[in-house]
Structures are given as structure tokens and as C-alpha cells.
């Protein structure tokens, strides 16, 4: 083996990824985002080589004095932007945050109610994901087709009849808020807990364009830190109930996480500070952009889901593309032109259509952070029409998409700081 040539392969693949996804593609994956240059710079630190099992100032390792301080700061900043009393940043994903909470609230064989799959329930809420792995029986609450949401009246009856250990709201195809305030009193009346999975909408929540579930009766708020909240990949658990929170916090280590990827912590802290300053403006622009994209797509003849409800109140837009070849074909075709979306089940799709659903899911949060606004959403919709409906030459369309993206390469809604005075050997993100 020529090690030097093999090394060059790895480096070139990394350079190619950075060039393609960071400078050439219009990224519309609803579960992704981009950190600020400052947050990225701090991500590349000695923290990534270290361990710190346990909680701050109560570790099972030595050498953690700076870890303890930065983790405490990060939790404090996150509580500030969330409006919560308690935070745990050790889950390394939103799914692990869910797992820790679910495991404490129920035992194998117990029942949990979840939002209906048609209303966007995440796979971790189902028998195919975390609940199934934990042996907890999940039961879907009734679906209201007209409102594309949980049917509150029938869900209340189900809660009173089944008396589950907990109820889960939130989801992954998530256009409209779930009825936290309407269900919380009934959940608590049967001695159950209400868990809200805000992985997708956490940044909208901290930006005050999405209601805070903790203010509406949720006992736990589980999130991802890298979707509409534009931080490093990771998870977090929030609560205002000290005793319940302590029970969950005690289980994260050693049940679900040993080392919790410490290099996330400075970047998470920086992102929280950025959202304290810019979060409301960012979230408002996200929702303006998603609405503008939905309306523009509809004007070009696309079958955008939820027209009678105003299409969306989140960062997402859902489009039925069955008549254009289906979700799998459309997602691949758009990718060939450098527009990145994902195929997605729509409310009317059967679960077995997961590999070739009728829909695509679009998220505008990353392109919003690169400075795109309503006018650019209309331009994206027209590009999609030219690719999928007019069937323009794919190479020509790729050039047009890349040219458009070249105008939006600077991350907005971000703090800056001159790190050069530290003479740090920071590894640049773009090689």
C-alpha cells in the first residue's frame, strides 16, 4: 500500500465534500444546518481528545477542570435561550435524549401514546425505533386529517382510557405545532408525563416563533442542537421539574452515554450566545422563507401539502411529487442538479412506501443562515420547476444552481471574534 496516495484520497474526499456541499449545492435537508465560523473554529480543540464521564465537578476522570467550566457555561446559556431551569447536554443526539427520558418514564411492557405517524412522529417514537428497543408499547393517537394534526378530542378519550406512562408530541415531518396546551392537563390527570420532541423546531422555539412546550405543560423538552438551532450535532434534555429531571440525568451515564463528545460544548455555548443576539431575527426569516417557498412552488403547479392551513408554520415544506415520478426519483433528480432534499412519507402514504414515498421534505433553515430571503425562495422554486417539470438539461441546471449558490457563501446571524491573538493552530473547515 502506498500510504501517501491513500492519505491523499482521504484528504481529497474531504475537500470535495466541503467544496460541494458548502459552496455548490442548495441544501434543503430539513434536519441539517451550518455552524458559524467561530463555532466551527472552537469545535477543533483539545476537547475532542478527552473524556469526562459523569457530571460537571463530579467526574470519574481527572483533567476535566476546563471541561467542567465550559459545560456549565453551555448549559447556562442553553437554559437562558430555552427559558428552562434544567439542562443536560450529554446526549449525543436527539434520539439518545429521547431514549434516556423514555427509559426513566416507563418499563418494558408499559404503554406510551405518540403523535400519529401522519402528523410526523419520529421513528424513535415507534416500535421500529427507540420505544421498540426499550420494549415500550407505542399507540398512535388519532389523526385529524383536516388540521393535519393530533385529533384532540379523540386523543383525550384515549389518554383517559389507556392511562399511558407518558405521551410524546413533536416529530420529523413537522409543519404545524402539536396541541401541547390542550393535551397537557389530561396527560397529567392520569399521572402520566408529557414529552415534547422539539428536535426539528428548537431553533424556532428559541427564536420565539414557535411556542415553548415547557410553558404549555410539557414535562420534558428533548432537542437536537443542529437543525433549526444551528449548532454542532448533538442532543439535549430540558425540564423545569427538578426531581423528574434528576431521575433522567442520573441515567444518561452510564446507561446511554459514556463520553459525550466534549468538543461540542464550546460550539454549543457559542451558538446559544448567537441565538441570544440573532435568534429571533433568524427564526422569523426562516418562517418567512418557508412560506415564500411553499407559495412559489404552488404557483408553479407543484402539489404543496397543507394549502388550506397556509402550507407551513415551521421551517419545512412538504410536496407531493407522485405525479413527477415519486419521492425517490425526484430527490435523486434534484441532487443531480445540486439541489439537496430528501424523499419523505406524506400523511396519506402507507408505512411500506418508505423507500419510494410520494413526497419530498424541504427545509429552508440552512440557506436562510447563508442569507437567502423570500426572493431567493422564488428563484429556487423556479429552478425546481425547470428541473422537474420542464426537464431542462441537467448539466445546464447544475450550473445555474451552482451560480446561485456562489452568491451566498457567508454565514449570517453569527458572532465574530479575532482568534489570531491567541496564535492558535486552528484547523480550517475548508481545506
Swiss-Prot record:
Keywords: Amino-acid biosynthesis, Cytoplasm, One-carbon metabolism, Pyridoxal phosphate, Transferase. Pathway: Amino-acid biosynthesis; glycine biosynthesis; glycine from L-serine: step 1/1. The modification N6-(pyridoxal phosphate)lysine is found at residue 227. It is found in: Cytoplasm. (6S)-5,6,7,8-tetrahydrofolate binds at residues 121-123. The record marks 226 as: Plays an important role in substrate specificity. It is an enzyme of class 2 (transferase). Its EC number is 2.1.2.-. One of its GO terms (cellular component) is cytoplasm. InterPro entries: PyrdxlP-dep_Trfase, PyrdxlP-dep_Trfase_major, PyrdxlP-dep_Trfase_small, Ser_HO-MeTrfase, Ser_HO-MeTrfase-like, SHMT-like_dom. GO terms for molecular function: glycine hydroxymethyltransferase activity; pyridoxal phosphate binding. The keyword Disulfide bond does not apply. Pfam families: SHMT. Its cofactor is pyridoxal 5'-phosphate. The keyword Transport does not apply. GO terms for biological process: glycine biosynthetic process from serine; tetrahydrofolate interconversion. Signal peptide: none annotated. Belongs to the SHMT family. Homodimer. Catalyzes the reversible interconversion of serine and glycine with a modified folate serving as the one-carbon carrier. Also exhibits a pteridine-independent aldolase activity toward beta-hydroxyamino acids, producing glycine and aldehydes, via a retro-aldol mechanism. This is Serine hydroxymethyltransferase. The lineage of its organism: Archaea, Thermoproteota, Thermoprotei, Sulfolobales, Sulfolobaceae.
Amino acid at each position: 500500500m502506498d500510504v501517501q496516495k491513500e492519505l491523499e484520497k482521504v484528504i481529497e474526499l474531504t475537500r470535495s465534500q466541503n467544496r460541494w456541499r458548502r459552496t455548490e449545492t442548495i441544501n434543503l435537508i430539513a434536519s441539517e444546518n451550518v455552524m458559524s465560523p467561530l463555532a466551527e473554529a472552537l469545535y477543533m480543540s483539545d476537547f475532542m481528545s478527552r473524556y469526562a464521564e459523569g457530571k460537571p465537578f463530579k467526574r470519574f476522570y481527572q483533567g476535566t477542570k476546563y471541561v467542567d467550566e465550559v459545560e456549565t457555561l453551555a448549559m447556562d446559556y442553553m437554559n437562558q435561550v430555552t427559558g428552562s431551569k434544567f439542562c443536560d447536554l450529554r446526549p449525543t443526539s436527539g434520539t439518545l435524549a429521547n431514549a434516556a427520558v423514555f427509559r426513566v418514564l416507563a418499563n418494558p411492557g408499559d404503554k406510551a401514546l405518540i403523535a400519529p405517524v401522519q402528523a410526523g412522529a419520529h421513528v424513535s417514537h415507534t416500535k421500529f425505533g427507540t420505544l421498540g428497543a426499550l420494549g415500550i408499547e407505542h399507540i398512535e393517537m388519532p389523526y385529524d386529517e383536516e388540521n393535519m394534526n393530533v385529533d384532540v378530542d379523540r386523543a383525550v378519550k384515549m389518554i383517559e382510557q389507556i392511562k399511558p406512562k407518558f405521551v410524546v408530541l413533536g416529530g420529523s415531518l413537522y409543519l404545524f405545532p402539536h396541541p401541547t396546551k390542550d393535551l397537557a392537563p389530561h396527560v397529567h390527570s392520569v399521572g402520566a408525563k408529557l414529552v415534547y420532541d422539539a428536535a426539528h423546531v428548537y431553533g424556532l422555539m428559541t427564536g420565539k416563533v414557535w411556542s415553548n412546550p415547557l410553558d404549555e405543560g410539557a414535562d420534558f423538552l428533548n432537542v437536537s442542537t443542529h437543525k433549526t438551532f444551528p449548532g454542532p450535532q448533538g442532543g439535549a434534555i430540558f425540564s423545569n421539574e427538578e426531581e423528574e429531571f434528576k431521575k433522567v440525568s442520573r441515567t444518561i451515564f452510564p446507561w446511554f452515554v459514556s463520553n459525550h463528545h466534549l468538543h461540542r460544548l464550546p460550539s454549543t455555548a457559542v451558538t446559544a450566545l448567537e441565538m441570544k443576539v440573532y435568534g429571533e431575527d433568524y427564526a422569523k426569516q426562516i418562517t418567512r422563507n418557508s412560506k415564500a417557498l411553499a407559495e412559489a412552488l404552488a404557483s408553479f403547479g407543484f402539489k404543496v401539502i397543507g394549502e388550506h392551513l397556509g402550507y407551513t408554520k415551521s421551517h419545512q415544506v412538504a410536496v407531493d411529487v407522485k405525479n413527477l415520478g415519486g419521492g425517490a426519483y425526484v430527490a435523486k433528480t434534484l441532487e443531480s442538479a445540486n439541489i439537496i432534499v430528501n424523499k419523505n412519507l406524506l400523511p396519506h402514504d402507507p408505512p411500506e412506501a418508505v423507500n419510494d414515498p410520494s413526497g419530498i421534505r424541504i427545509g429552508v433553515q440552512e440557506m436562510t443562515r447563508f442569507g437567502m430571503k423570500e426572493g431567493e425562495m422564488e428563484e429556487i422554486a423556479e429552478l425546481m420547476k425547470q428541473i422537474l417539470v420542464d426537464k431542462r438539461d441537467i448539466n445546464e441546471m447544475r450550473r445555474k444552481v451552482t451560480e446561485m449558490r456562489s452568491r451566498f457563501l457567508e454565514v449570517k446571524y453569527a458572532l465574530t471574534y479575532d482568534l489570531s491573538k491567541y496564535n492558535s493552530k486552528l484547523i480550517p473547515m475548508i481545506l
